[in-house]
């Protein structure tokens, strides 16, 4: 018999998000949450990444996500993937662009790497908001983020017949980079294959 595969948000999420119905009116406020989640996740033994799904217009938080690769022994459990999975369960659909749902965005403390780029592609999200860049992640942590097309932003924004995904970069980039640097300084695990 094979084990049941379940990803569970850590209990401390409720400390960081005591009011799950709170609205975050600006991109900066939304990114501040993603960065706080990344910081707390490092202290809890996870990877240095945080993410959240929000309704674009209202700023209503739909779902948080943190990197659970090490604590939950699952290379799929990156912060963006966890946030998308939680949002899909909250909304009870695999398609976050389904009729009746407001347009949603993924706010992530760092640019999605190759795996999360694919997850984003199929999620139904309307916008991606990024803190640190790929080169920041690689230089500050030592992770290898894998290959992305040079024109990855253009491919997201224009992808017929699918609707485009808008991209906003460098939101609180300095603060996001500070979290990445702290992970390395604290001896954070490089959980890449063979790492």
Language-model segments: what does each one mean?
Residues 63-65:
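Short hydrophobic alpha-helix segments
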Residues 49-55:
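Short beta-strand scaffold segments in enzyme catalytic cores
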Residues 1-40, 102, 119-195:
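Zinc-dependent deaminase
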Residues 42-46:
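Short loop/turn motifs at secondary-structure junctions and domain boundaries
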Residues 68-82:
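A short, polar/charged loop-to-alpha-helix boundary motif
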Residues 73, 107-127:
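Local cysteine-cluster metal-coordination motifs and their immediate loop/turn environment
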Residues 97-111:
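Immediate flanking context of iron-sulfur cluster ligation sites
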